Amino acid sequence: MSGLPVKKAGLIVAVEMFAVFEGWGQPDEIYEGRYFKLCRYDRYDMQIFVARSGPGQKNAEDAARMLIDDIGVAELWNFGVAGGLTEAAHVGDVFVIDEVIRWDGVCGSGVFEADGAERGRRCGCGARPEAFRVDAPAGAADVRQGVLASGDSVVSARGARLMLADITGADIVDMEGAGIAAAAASGSYPCFMVKCVSDGIDTDEAMLTADFRRTARRAFDAFDMMLKKSQV
């Protein structure tokens, strides 16, 4: 890297860290952060700090705020798997998120612990134009813009997923996106999320187990392609 200031970016990963290791190899540095262990990669003329948060909104929000406050990252990223909420969200489809909807309360309160927002809050998530100038990863039906519903409860039943889609207008659901979006919104930090559908509305448990690693890696590959494109 040159003597110029190096851009720092933060990547929050819930449980898909294996895909980072498979795609980028071993990190340039590993050390203990305030809440979570951090891996640093020097790639694309940047320092990329990766925090494995584990599942859940509060963990993801804590990881994002640690990256902002302790590392001084300029933007936040996330890739990972998500559940499909409609018939149109197929296993293997890749979504670049342009809006995150907080859909459930923490501990039944109806208020999101990370920022005190009521359920139903909508956060913009900055889908980048270059995301739509890349080829879909092998086998993916589509790479498209989408809306992410995000909450601390697991939504698995077909009826519950269809109802959530109807209420929120979301395409997919996860358990971390709202925490990351809340941290980004608190300081107007750019936020970029890429999700791959690991389970559709009719996916059974056996299929989910079989598809998880494949779709997590597909999410990473799509994210990495878009990241390369954005640095050109």
Predicted regions and their residues:
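N-terminal short beta-loop-beta anion/metal-coordinating cradle
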Residues: 1-65
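Glycine-rich phosphate-binding loop signature in dinucleotide/nucleotide-binding domains
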Residues: 4, 67-74, 187-189
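Structural motif
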Residues: 10, 74-77
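Active-site-proximal beta-strand elements of phosphoester/diester hydrolases
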Residues: 48-54, 145-149, 194
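Mid-sequence, gly/pro-rich, charge-dense loop/helix-turn segments that line enzyme active sites
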Residues: 84-168
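A C-terminal functional module that forms or caps the active site or interfaces directly
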Residues: 153-202, 210
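Regulatory input/activation interfaces that engage signals or partners
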Residues: 191, 196-232
